[in-house]
Design a protein with these regions (language model features):
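A nucleotide- and high-energy phosphate-metabolite-utilizing enzyme signature
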Residues: 1-179, 183
Length: 183
């Protein structure tokens, strides 16, 4: 149908974005800007946009997809978890890093959804009160508010570590630049 025709016409443009001069540094700067805009009081509670949160997993997967997806069509998937699987299968990210990112992504998504259910509105902040944290603990299979804090801290640190190793790797920028000059 018409939608398929449109997708076929637009797809090459999507996968050529990684060929733009300065694409990798601009993408990195965009992520830094997003984190810098978080209010200081919310920095350690921002599940979606904060350092080590959902966006770090998504930016990591999408950057690698856009850099390598020009050449490798197996990376042209829409969702984050399948993207991480494809990136690991293609050798663009270690299987261990992909598994850690997938596990963290699933947990952070569940936490985000549970918090939204409790508040009956879109929010991406961990509760800042003991009752809210205990309620979240029960909703995600943990026992205490302290356990939520520990798990959140460990998870966000693991994401930040993997994100830093991949997203800021000089190899990613070098590959992007080499593909620009080959194209």
């Amino acid at each position: 149908g018409l939608g398929d025709v449109y997708k076929r016409q637009v797809s090459p443009m999507v996968w050529q974005v990684g060929e733009a001069e300065g694409f990798v540094p601009e993408t990195r700067a965009m992520r830094t800007r997003v984190v810098s805009l978080i209010a200081a009081k919310n920095k350690g509670r921002e599940i979606k946009l904060g350092a080590g949160g959902l966006r770090d997993v998504e930016f990591t997967a999408q950057l690698l997809q856009l850099v390598h997806g020009r050449q490798d069509e197996s990376l042209r998937v829409r969702a984050t978890l399948p993207a991480l699987r494809a990136l690991a299968a293609g050798g663009y990210i270690s299987r261990g890093a992909a598994e850690r990112l997938k596990e963290a992504y699933r947990l952070e998504r569940v936490m985000e959804h549970r918090v939204q259910m409790f508040r009956l509105r879109r929010t991406h902040l961990l509760p800042d009160d003991e009752d809210g944290l205990r309620r979240l603990a029960r909703a995600v299979g943990l026992r205490t508010a302290d356990e939520v804090r520990r798990v959140w801290t460990a998870t966000s640190k693991a994401v930040l570590r993997a994100h830093g190793q991949v997203f800021y790797s000089p190899v990613v920028e070098a590959v992007a630049l080499s593909l620009i000059h080959i194209s």
